Structure formats: structure tokens, C-alpha cells
């Protein structure tokens, strides 16, 4: 029975809301820094804006987003093992969506949108389980920079800038701030965009139940625009055997 479960693989379409809600993800085997560059963020925001604005009509309210076309972001690969859920492939996109949600959270406040029209985005950033509150993407080295961007994004970060991921997170958040389209940056459109982003942006969640199967899937898939070096792939494979 255990072997049957270990060999099981599930694939489901899931909205961003369903993926980032009440889960805690580890990135503890296939170690990979956050490496997206400005071009990746530019492409992501452009694609999202084009898809959303091709559906949105002036005057649309929050009740209209559900009739809009979905936007598919491709697969992510997860491994569920011993009660823990690890991201094997897809953390570049999920980290980028986390940064976008942080930005949108501040933007909806700064635009003076009525509280009843604001979306509670905290539940897509943090999760509380077993009395412990952590980032949904539970990576210790990123906790301080994400907290900083959540609380004081306009101030200079005084934490550790030696970490490649921390530096890239700061730069990519700034890119989001500079690149987010003016057509969506107003109190009428933004709430509809946020609802659409959360519920109509869809990823294919591929879930394996053993690291061996997860690694096999991992070899055939990659984050958008990023390739792993042979050394990184070998490291991931060796760590999966520990």
C-alpha cells in the first residue's frame, strides 16, 4: 500500500487562490535561489495585464470577474512526503506572485479603496498551523525581507544583502512597482483585477508522493525561462536520496 501511494502522481488545475491558501511550502531538497530578472517580471505583468484588459469593460464590478477568461501559467511540481509539502519546480513563479501580492496589498490601501472592496491578501502570504505563523513559502532566509516589504516597502532594507535571493527579491519588487500598468492602477479597476488574479489565474499542480517520482518529473520541467545547471540537478538528485 505504501509503495502504491509513493508511486502515485496527481495533476489538477488550481487557481492561485487554491494553491496559496492554507498551505505551507518547503524548498528544502532541490535548492534553488530566486533568480528571476527584470525581463521575467516584465513578461509576467504584461501577459497578465493583456489577458485581464481584454476581458475588462469600463464599469465592470466585482461580480463580473468570474465571466472573464482564465489565464494559464503552466505547471508546478510538488512533493507530499511525511506530512510536508515541498516545491520541486515552480518556486520562481510562486515567489514572483508573492511579490506581486505584496505590491497589490499596498496599492489597494494607497488608492483609498473602500474596506469592503479590498481583498484580504494576508491569507495568501502567511499561514498559521499548529500555533505557528510563517510565510506560505517557508524559507527562513527570506522571512526578514518579505516582512520588510509587507510593512515598510519604501524604506531601505537593512538586513543581509549577501544573499542572492534577497537582492533579487528587492530588485524584482521594485520592477513590479515601476512596471505595473497605469490602466489598472485606479480604485475602480484594481479590485476587479485582484479578484481575477486570485481566482482566474490557473496553474497545473502536479503532486508526487515520493522524491524519486518528483525528481523524474522535475527533470522534464523547468521554471519559465530558467534552466538548471547539471551541478544543480545532480545536487537535487543526491539530496533526494538522503
Segments (PLM) and residue ranges:
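Glycine- and hydrophobic-rich flexible loops that cap the catalytic core of alpha/beta enzyme folds
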Residues: 2-242
